[in-house]
Each structure stands twice: as structure tokens, then as C-alpha cells.
Amino acid sequence: MNMNEFKGVIEGLLFASGDEGVTAKQLSKILDIGLDTVEHILEELRFEYEREDRGLMIIQSNNIFHLATKPEHSSYFKRLIDSPRTSKMSQAALETLAIIAYRQPITRAEIDEIRGVRSERPVQTLITRNLIEETGRKDTVGRPVLFQTSKEFLTFFGLATLDDLPPLPENIDPDKEEREADLFFERFQDEV
């Protein structure tokens, strides 16, 4: 690979790493190139983003590099967040919503444990759509935030109370459960 190709891959890795970011050392290991080369490419990318009229920038904090939006464009990002949503919710968001609905109040760590993957983004999506809300903190180490469904959740799904949620099945056949879940998600994808 030449330097421009490495630059493109590093840019993609910065994007893919999201909020967690990535260290130069990690990039060096992933790309199997020297740390000096990675740092040089990061500096070039940073310069290009700063020099050109671009919407993104590379920030570094605690030796972790992040791809971020430029603060001077924040009013446009706020408009996007505040605009009515017509997009569909992801399956991850729907799964997370179901877990919260049936297990509330619940912490994000508990949601992660049930799903087997991190749920930070689905939780944020549900908060943004006002389907869930923070309801306090759990009385345990670290005092994590507890989440519950909101009044908008009840309204959106046409429920008077949480007691109107359909009961969870007791004897679960995993194959049948997956087929039914797929049908459920297909039905609500059109509505959400």
C-alpha cells in the first residue's frame, strides 16, 4: 500500500472507531506499519482537515485520536437532531427498547449483558426519540443511570399502561422466537 492508501484506511478506522477513538499504537498494529509513519499520516490528515473547508477534524485526547465534527457547524447538527425523524429504527434500538420495556428500570450495563453487545448508541437513539428516559440512579457501585420507558413510548405503541404489554412467552423455542422476532421487527420497521 502507498501512503495515500494508508491515509484512506486510517481515516476510515478513525470513523469506524466512533466515540471510543483509536490510538496511534493500535493503528500501527492494525496496519502493520511503524508508529512514526502512523503519526506522520495522522498529522497530514489533521493538517488537511484544518486547511480545507471541511466539516470534520481530528482531535487527540489522552493519546486517543477521534474524528469529530467542527464546532463552528454545531447549529446545523442541532437542526438535524431536532428535526422530525422519518428514518427507521435499527434492530438494535428495537431490541434495546423491548429489554427496557420489560425489565425497567434497568442500567445500560444490564442491557449490554442481556444483548451481549454494547448498547450505547441504541440507548442514545431511544432517548433522542423520547421513547425512554433516565429515571434515577441504581444504588450500587458507580451509581449507574437507570432507564425506563417514557409516556411517549406508551402513546407511540398505543398502550394505556405498561400492563398492556403482551406477556413474554414462558417456553421459548429459539428458532421460532427468532422467526417471530423477525416478523415483529418487520412490522414495526414500517411504523417507526
From Swiss-Prot:
InterPro entries: ScpB_csome_segregation, WH-like_DNA-bd_sf, WH_DNA-bd_sf. GO terms for biological process: cell division; chromosome separation; DNA replication. Gene3D superfamilies: Winged helix-like DNA-binding domain superfamily/Winged helix DNA-binding domain. Participates in chromosomal partition during cell division. May act via the formation of a condensin-like complex containing Smc and ScpA that pull DNA away from mid-cell into both cell halves. NCBIfam families: SMC-Scp complex subunit ScpB (TIGR00281). Homodimer. Homodimerization may be required to stabilize the binding of ScpA to the Smc head domains. Component of a cohesin-like complex composed of ScpA, ScpB and the Smc homodimer, in which ScpA and ScpB bind to the head domain of Smc. The presence of the three proteins is required for the association of the complex with DNA. This is Segregation and condensation protein B. It comes from Oceanobacillus iheyensis (strain DSM 14371 / CIP 107618 / JCM 11309 / KCTC 3954 / HTE831).
